[in-house]
Amino acid sequence: MRTLDFPYLIIPEMMADTLDRYVEKLGNPVPVRKMVVEAGEATFVGDTHGALDVSSYALAVSRNSALVCFVGDLVDRGKNQLYNLLFIVESAIISRRVVIVRGNHESTLTNDYYGFSDELKNLNVFDHLYPHVVRLYGRLPYALLLNNCILAVHGGIASDPSSLHAWDSLPMDDPEPSNPGAFQILWNDPREYVDGFLPGTRGEGTYLFGPDAFNEFTEKNGINFLIRAHEVKKSGYEYMFQGKLVSIFSSRYHKGKAAILKMTFGTDSRQEIMVVPDEEDSIEWPANPV
């Protein structure tokens, strides 16, 4: 497998400046970012976990997309966590069409256990850079609402709050996050066999939600499709709840496939799952990825 070169030197000040510029661009943080794509494409990328080649591929094949949304988990687990984070952040700085939604690994709770803190320490940048990373975590939106009816979140719906209007009041600048509702949005998982909400398998404060809870949420909030990431899928994706929910996973650390979702709006509305090629040698670094 080919490793992509990355145009950064290990200079903490440069890296911190990149993160700070994106925080400045985000401005006043909002829990739910709202966008409209009336015609054209929107692309959604699931967990990349340091898969810089997948992130590069996603942007390279999405040059015609009006929106490219990375649905969280840019760091931890993989080989190029810091560079993957910086590449996506730099792309979001350059182009407003690139959006980052927060995942459960954009958190101080996970980085010490799943590799990101160790990577920063091995690069001798942890003390200088990590405070800037944490500040960024707290400014990322928990969800993206597209065209008022398509919701992208990392984990899933929360047992409480159950309305998007209430989601708009979730506290920001919360590095864990400690708010139970925000925590659930990042950590919860869907299951076909569950009635309502049941305690999850990922630890205290996490839940599984079933089709009845999902349908109640979507009907209450006018949502007709939910895009989420968070769970390893051998094929890179899985549809659930009669096709109204899709899980997208965009990393190969689990030895499975990596996939991205393209949606087209307008007279020819459709969805397309794109499986990322297994051989990185088939991927060229985009000269102008955004």
Indicate residue ranges for each PLM-predicted region:
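Feature recognizes metal-dependent phosphohydrolase scaffolds
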Residues: 1-290
